[in-house]
Swiss-Prot record:
This is UPF0325 protein VP2321. It comes from the Bacteria. Pfam families: DUF3461. Belongs to the UPF0325 family. InterPro entries: UPF0325. Signal peptide: none annotated.
Length: 127
């Protein structure tokens, strides 16, 4: 029924609650969240990274200039189609987009702060 999700090792798609998709450098990161089971504090999730496909597009035919562009991996689009059938996501409003951008920014701040602290701790060990 869901061959691409099964290919990712997800054998019970009915347990999927939602998913998120974000871009990091030249990769798309898909995170799938499952329904929380009894006795669990947090819902389980799995993360998959897909490299973006690189294409050269002709920008100016007179000078034969090309521009390198990236686009979503074809396999990822097939997985997202299956996820949309399961989760039936609602239309996203402009306010929701703003909230998502702010949420992504806060997440990035935490990741960078954590990495800086880790590097500083490594430096302290060297003293």
């Amino acid at each position: 029924m869901y061959p691409h999700l099964t290919g990712l090792g997800i054998h019970d798609p009915k347990q999927i609650e939602r998913y998120s998709l974000r871009q990091e450098a030249h990769k798309d990161v898909l995170k799938i969240y499952f329904h929380k089971q009894k006795g669990e504090f947090f819902a389980k999730s799995v993360k998959f990274k897909y490299p973006r496909q690189v294409k050269n597009v002709l920008v100016d035919s007179g000078s034969h200039k090309y521009k390198e562009v990236t686009e979503i991996n074809r396999n990822l689009t097939l997985v997202i189609d299956e996820l949309n059938k399961i989760t039936k996501p609602a239309k996203v409003s402009e306010l929701d987009v703003k909230q998502k951008i702010l949420s992504d920014l806060r997440h990035l701040e935490k990741v960078v702060s954590s990495k800086i602290a880790e590097i500083e701790a490594d430096l302290e060990k060297l003293k």
